[in-house]
């Protein structure tokens, strides 16, 4: 393909599309640039696999450190395991792209996005999302696009398209909206307790920009002489479906109408019906068309039965406005919660139940040194003081599987719940702890990520973290049949699996802190999105009220097993003195007191120990070391060495001065050793600090009260 370039302008910021320059053997490729940020996105298709019942789409986003002019650390000096941010960006690309591929497509598809250059202004993630659509179009893959994404920021009262990092940091909103010509497909946002109307307006504002990017893609395709591929779906043999409908429809509808059934009971009842069908088919002659259709692949019977069940469940909701558990469309499942369910060795814990979904969250308070360093990120010098980790063991859905490292889903759910809590955390100056919350999904029947938000709030309050406001969350669903639309509150597993939308909304009673919307259809109108957001508010506040009946304010004290933190400020020029050569001084203080010391570049010193007395002792030592000395100050010290003309005394940790032989006594001293020996405790006064910083001490002219006070201060420091 010949090289071609096209530009689109947003508020004076250009997005440049370069086609035919790089990756000529990929199915489709584009270099998408804005400012000095450049992302290469490729799309490649290979022949389909036999016997699979899903679209094998793989999306990989990676960042090369050369993009920021950096060399990786470690022995190998090359990029290693992808950091969490790249996994989240891979998901950000996948989520709006996947629903636009035909449901029948079974070819292997791979989208690879490489950030090859990055400036300090333009985030690469939304460029990668739009680039994925362009690469797919160029690769001539069947695709119900184009699709594009933009970021919306809010600085003051003004919405901004594709804000810079600084504008995102300064604003109250970080929202990514992706859409197709058919409507909005995906929304991802973090917000500072913004009201629903602002979020809806931001989505609308962003979708207008998305439409401009879609038009630019259509123009690009036309200018390249390409056509959007719309392959006809393969013919589907209805033999097996008709057979199952004739024999099982009444039983399926009857089971779906038994609202008293629990999820396991409903699943078991449906399995009995499916097994009876399988038995009947197995008794048919081998050449029977029905048996041939059922044995065409190992999943034919199960998938067909699932599709028929999906049809009747959706019809029941649309026609009767009733769900499989008997709830109204806007009704939340029964909610209960507890705090302090684990012993106080765990700094805080919260148990949240909503229907059959159960999440146990545990909070741990750590020291500043426990913050997560993000040096592998293209944005350097970053760290996280709040961490949320989400675990989804197989027993939570009654399955047996090997336990493995967290996958993309677990990382994504954990990040969403983390984002929901961030706006209500106390400032570092008020609460200097590093905070980690782990949410264990103990039982899953839908909306576990929002259950993790609720569990996190309970655990934080139980741990004594003074959060600004409690946060709750709810997941909304959607059933769309033609023009008929039903928005479902607090979806359970089967509604998530068989529905058209998963829309998670978290926030306080003042506004939204996080939301995430994913579609299984090719787009949704703003009116339906607005309905879901407002319906979610009612659900959130209902759940929040139930949580506040368990604990309405954070505990006033932290666990006795949590570290006690003391924070002081020292002159940054004194940092080297506290650390000492090779860390000798700070290690010595730690060994002597049992306290941990963290020092920041601005001179903030955080001292921690489970025993507060140990922390105070270390604080006193550091304060003594960094105290500004004045002539006339009196200290208790110990003789460290003797020379012919005097004795050296350490009177503060790391600070030493000399007593001249003439200042040892108010009479003539013949030999220093006649008055003091190494290890002796002596009371000294600062006599002089010369222009080289050398400290001259004396034992003369010290009042008994001064000596007593110095001994007392020294005893405290010990």
UniProtKB/Swiss-Prot annotation:
Cell location: Cytoplasm
EC number of the protein: 2.7.7.8
Record keywords, A-Z: Cytoplasm, Magnesium, Metal-binding, Nucleotidyltransferase, RNA-binding, Transferase
CDD domains the UniProt entry points to: KH-I_PNPase (cd02393), RNase_PH_PNPase_1 (cd11363), RNase_PH_PNPase_2 (cd11364), S1_PNPase (cd04472)
Pfam families: KH_1, PNPase, RNase_PH, RNase_PH_C, S1
GO cellular component: cytosol
Record-stated family: Belongs to the polyribonucleotide nucleotidyltransferase family.
Cited function: Involved in mRNA degradation. Catalyzes the phosphorolysis of single-stranded polyribonucleotides processively in the 3'- to 5'-direction.
Protein name: Polyribonucleotide nucleotidyltransferase
Organism from which the protein derives: Trichormus variabilis (strain ATCC 29413 / PCC 7937) (Anabaena variabilis)
Gene: pnp
């Amino acid at each position: 393909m010949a090289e071609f370039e096209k530009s689109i302008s947003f508020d004076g910021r250009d997005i440049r599309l370069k086609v035919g320059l790089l990756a000529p053997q990929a199915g489709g490729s584009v270099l998408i640039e804005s400012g000095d940020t450049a992302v290469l996105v490729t799309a490649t298709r290979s022949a389909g696999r036999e016997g699979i019942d899903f679209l094998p789409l793989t999306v990989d986003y990676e960042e090369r450190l050369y993009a920021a002019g950096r060399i990786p650390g470690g022995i190998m000096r090359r990029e290693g395991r992808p950091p969490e941010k790249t996994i989240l960006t891979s998901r950000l690309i996948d989520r709006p792209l996947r629903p636009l591929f035909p449901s029948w497509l079974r070819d292997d598809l791979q989208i690879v996005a490489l950030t090859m250059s990055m400036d300090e202004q333009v985030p690469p993630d939304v460029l990668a999302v739009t680039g994925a659509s362009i690469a797919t179009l160029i690769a001539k893959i069947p695709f119900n696009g184009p699709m594009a994404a933009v970021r919306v920021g809010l600085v003051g009262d003004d919405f901004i398209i594709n804000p810079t990092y600084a504008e995102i940091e300064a604003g109250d909103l970080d929202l990514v909206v992706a859409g197709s010509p058919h409507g909005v497909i995906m929304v991802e946002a973090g917000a500072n307790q913004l009201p629903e109307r602002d979020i809806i307006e931001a989505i609308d504002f962003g979708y207008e920009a998305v439409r401009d990017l879609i038009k630019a893609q259509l123009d690009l395709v036309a200018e390249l002489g390409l056509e959007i591929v719309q392959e006809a779906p393969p013919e589907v043999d209805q033999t097996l479906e008709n057979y199952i409908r004739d024999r099982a429809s009444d039983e399926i509808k009857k089971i779906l109408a038994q609202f008293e059934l629990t999820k396991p009971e409903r699943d078991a009842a449906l399995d009995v019906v499916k097994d009876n069908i399988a038995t009947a088919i197995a008794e048919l002659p081998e050449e029977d068309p029905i048996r041939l259709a059922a044995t065409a692949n190992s999943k034919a019977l199960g998938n067909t039965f699932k599709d028929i069940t999906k049809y009747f469940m959706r019809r029941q909701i649309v026609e009767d406005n009733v769900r499989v558990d008997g709830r109204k469309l806007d009704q939340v499942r029964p909610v209960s919660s507890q705090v302090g369910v684990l012993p106080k060795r765990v700094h805080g814990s919260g148990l949240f139940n909503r229907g059959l979904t159960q999440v146990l969250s545990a909070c741990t308070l750590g020291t500043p040194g426990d913050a997560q360093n993000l040096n592998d990120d293209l944005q350097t010098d970053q760290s996280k003081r709040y961490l949320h980790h989400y675990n989804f063991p197989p027993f939570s859905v009654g399955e047996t599987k090997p336990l493995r490292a967290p996958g993309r889903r677990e990382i994504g759910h954990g990040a969403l719940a983390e984002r929901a809590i961030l706006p209500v955390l106390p400032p570092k100056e008020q609460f200097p702890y590093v905070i980690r919350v782990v949410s264990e999904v103990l039982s899953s029947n839908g909306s576990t990520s929002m259950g993790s938000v609720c569990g996190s709030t309970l655990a934080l309050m139980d741990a004594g973290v003074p959060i600004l406001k409690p946060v709750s969350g709810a997941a909304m669903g959607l059933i769309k049949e033609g023009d008929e639309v039903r928005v479902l509150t607090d979806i359970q597993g089967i509604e998530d699996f068989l529905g058209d939308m998963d829309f998670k909304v978290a926030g306080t009673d003042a506004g939204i802190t996080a939301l995430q919307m994913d579609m299984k259809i090719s787009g949704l109108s703003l009116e339906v999105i607005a309905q879901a957001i407002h319906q979610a508010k009612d659900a959130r506040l209902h759940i929040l009220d139930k949580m506040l009946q368990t604990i309405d304010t954070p505990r006033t004290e932290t666990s006795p097993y949590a570290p006690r933190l003391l924070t002081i400020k020292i002159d940054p020029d004194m940092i080297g003195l506290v650390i000492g050569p090779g860390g000798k001084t700070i290690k010595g203080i730690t060994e002597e007191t049992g306290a941990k010391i963290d020092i920041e570049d601005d001179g903030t010193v955080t001292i921690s120990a489970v025993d507060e007395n140990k922390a105070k002792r270390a604080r006193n030592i550091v304060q003594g070391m960094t105290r500004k000395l004045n002539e006339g100050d009196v200290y208790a010290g110990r003789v460290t060495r003797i020379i012919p003309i005097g004795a050296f005394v350490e009177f503060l940790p790391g600070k030493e001065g000399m007593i001249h032989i003439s200042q040892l006594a108010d009479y003539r001293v013949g030999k220093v050793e006649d008055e003091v020996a190494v290890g002796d405790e002596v009371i000294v006064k600062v006599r002089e600090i010369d222009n080289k910083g050398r400290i001259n001490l004396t034992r003369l002219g010290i009042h008994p009260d001064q000596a007593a006070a110095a001994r007392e201060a020294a005893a405290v420091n010990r």
